[in-house]
Amino acid sequence: MFASLKLALVYLALGPIAGIIGIPYTLLVGDITRLYRVAMWITNAGVRAAGIKIDISGLENIPAGRSCIFMSNHVSNLDPPVTIPLLPGRSSVLLKKQLMDIPILGRAMRMAKFVPVERGSRRDAAQASVAAAGDALRSGLHILVYPEGTRSPDGRLSTFKKGPFFLALETKAPIVPIAVSGTQTMMRKGSNAIVPGVARIRLLPAIEPSDYATREDLMRAVRNAIAEALPTEMKPADYLTMAL
């Protein structure tokens, strides 16, 4: 409870100040880089204030000078605020389309090239999201996606959606798999309470989409890489048969 309160206090104290000053400045100059850096600093400060320690490895696996698609398992609402500030440069994320309709903030999100997604949307809307993500990659940004599509209900790696792999094959952007563990016990699904602990972030060797003949082969390779890096209790139920 106290950890959640500390995180909330940091965000409530610093977030509005950054927004009041940063968003108008960003809209005026047409460059979101400074606001993004401030937002990442505040995000990281809140995480650490909540008593969350971060153990990260594998940053050397990010291909230099190339826009990447980071693909991570998803076990907690803490995953994005723990992970994104650690990634170099700027990263775009996929978010609910409705958030883009918020006055001023929505415009800033569009400037940041965040990608709007409609859950359960029709085919053309999904294709529009893929196109927007491709545009973000071509502009030099990274993309962070959770190919499971939602948080795992039990902490184990779930099945993957095909959309992110279509994006990877279309753009030929390297995929950097990420294995996240620890956050599933710090903020469980369905709860807002935070329990201090250690979040372990493992960035794995990059996977080149062009090395795979089909989307299914690429998806299998990424899922296998993440599964292999997760602790036993988080490996998928089909782990023993995945490589067969």
Language model regions located:
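Catalytic core of membrane glycerolipid acyltransferases/transacylases, capturing the structured
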Residues: 18-35, 49-50, 64-122
